[in-house]
């Protein structure tokens, strides 16, 4: 193959296809100037709802903060917009699966402190995230300096909750379109109320209990369509008391949920108080925040990285419609495609929507980079369960090594399943070794 056909942005070599989503395709790759491993996202320029330029802008707001990946380049290549971003490790959802779909109290408390810090950072930048879920939190690449740092990715749903200059909070409103993932979204979001900081924190609490319990009481509900399913999930969340949700686990988790659900729409959360709750969990449990997580103890203490030839990961293959809703396949189809042998891959992880997990070697030849065709819209926009006409008021991420032509960016010094009312860009990203 001609090397020129697999180099984009002047010096980024495109490797293998590692994921795809509603809006494009992802490849791994390498920066030819410094041999740094990267991920490259491709988006058709004629996409009805292009996201990569906005994604760049969001990362520009957040750059320099712990747990926010670096993004190096945004530009155009042929029929596509491309974005070059740090190659990270697996998502917390992946690690959760590999740990038998249950985390220890210690791991949940330590992970909660990191996740809470990331959300606080976003809030301090005047944004609410609006799609908290385990898939959107990744750890660092194995053997890297920050291998067990929790990173936050996929800011396609983020929105300003206050004016960056005046700090004036947006007004309270109702009858809003759903945005986020039904399993984890707040009760107020289900009720069509404008989201604010309190909703991100409530969603975090649902994720914490998911990690502790293995599942949430509102998972697995059956309904004729997504609208009715969201309604059932909402009803079950409202009827499940906090004491029932948190039964059998340290009382601090109940205190967390009680506090975040009691916040007013425009109230500033006491993040220090919430952090202290998880410190209390560790102390009461006789643990310390030593950075030793459950996934590091797999394979007789060798860690998840050494599990590539030993683990079979159960993965549900989903198809996505125009609205970005992940529709679970029927049971027969799921069984047929349920087991993914990891012998030929280091790991998998998710930048947003979890999708097909059929990894293959794929070079970024122009002939193979045809624009993706999104499926036809099948849901009405007339209810709060449909995509808003403004595309969820997206704001977005990114960084650049050297702008050229239409490229934008700045120089960087370094370097069970519930339907989702969400349109994320990509499904998965994995670290792979170059031969």
From Swiss-Prot:
Q: Which reaction does it catalyse?
A: L-seryl-[protein] + ATP = O-phospho-L-seryl-[protein] + ADP + H(+); L-threonyl-[protein] + ATP = O-phospho-L-threonyl-[protein] + ADP + H(+)
Q: What does this protein do?
A: Casein kinases are operationally defined by their preferential utilization of acidic proteins such as caseins as substrates. May contribute to the regulation of morphology.
Gene name as annotated: cki2
Main localization (coarse): cytoplasm
Compartmental location: Cytoplasm
> Where are the catalytic residues?
131 (proton acceptor)
* A GO biological-process term: regulation of endocytosis
Q: Where is the Protein kinase domain?
A: 12-282
* Name used for this protein in its record: Casein kinase I homolog 2
């Amino acid at each position: 193959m001609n090397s020129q056909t697999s180099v984009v942005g002047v010096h980024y070599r495109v490797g293998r296809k590692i994921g795809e989503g509603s809006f494009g395709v992802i490849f791994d790759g390498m920066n030819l100037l410094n041999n740094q491993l990267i991920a490259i996202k491709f988006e058709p320029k004629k996409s009805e709802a292009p996201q990569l330029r906005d994604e760049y802008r969001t990362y520009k707001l957040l750059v320099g903060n712990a747990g926010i990946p670096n993004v190096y380049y945004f530009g155009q290549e042929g029929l596509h917009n491309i974005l070059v971003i740090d190659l990270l490790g697996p998502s917390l959802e992946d690690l959760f699966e590999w740990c038998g779909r249950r985390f220890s109290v210690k791991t949940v408390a330590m992970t909660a402190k990191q996740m809470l810090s990331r959300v606080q950072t976003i809030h301090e930048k005047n944004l609410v995230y609006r799609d908290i879920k385990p898939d959107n939190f990744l750890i660092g690449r194995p053997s890297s300096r920050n291998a067990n740092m929790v990173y936050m990715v996929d800011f396609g749903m983020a929105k300003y909750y206050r004016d960056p200059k005046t700090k004036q909070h947006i007004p309270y409103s109702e009858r809003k379109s759903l945005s986020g993932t039904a399993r984890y979204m707040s009760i107020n979001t289900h009720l069509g109320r404008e989201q604010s900081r309190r909703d991100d924190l409530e969603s975090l609490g649902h994720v914490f209990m998911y990690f502790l319990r293995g599942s949430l009481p509102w998972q697995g509900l059956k309904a004729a369509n997504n609208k009715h399913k969201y309604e059932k999930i909402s009803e079950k969340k409202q009827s499940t008391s906090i004491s029932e949700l948190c039964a059998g686990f340290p009382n601090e988790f109940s205190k967390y949920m009680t506090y975040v659900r009691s916040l007013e729409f425009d109230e500033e959360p006491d993040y220090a108080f919430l952090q202290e709750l998880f410190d209390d969990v560790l102390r009461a449990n006789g643990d310390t925040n030593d950075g030793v997580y459950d996934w590091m103890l797999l394979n007789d203490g060798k860690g998840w990285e050494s599990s590539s030839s030993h683990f079979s990961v159960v993965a549900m293959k989903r198809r996505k419609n125009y609205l970005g809703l992940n529709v679970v396949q029927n049971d027969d189809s799921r069984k047929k495609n349920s087991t993914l042998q990891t012998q030929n891959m280091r790991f998998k992880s998710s930048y947003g929507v979890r999708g097909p997990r059929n990894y293959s070697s794929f070079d970024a030849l122009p002939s193979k980079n045809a624009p993706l065709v999104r499926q036809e819209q099948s849901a009405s926009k007339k209810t709060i369960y449909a995509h808003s006409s403004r595309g969820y008021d997206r704001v977005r991420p990114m960084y650049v090594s050297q702008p050229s032509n239409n490229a934008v960016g700045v120089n960087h010094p370094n370097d069970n399943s519930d339907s989702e009312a969400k349109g994320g860009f990509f499904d998965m990203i994995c670290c792979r070794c170059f031969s």
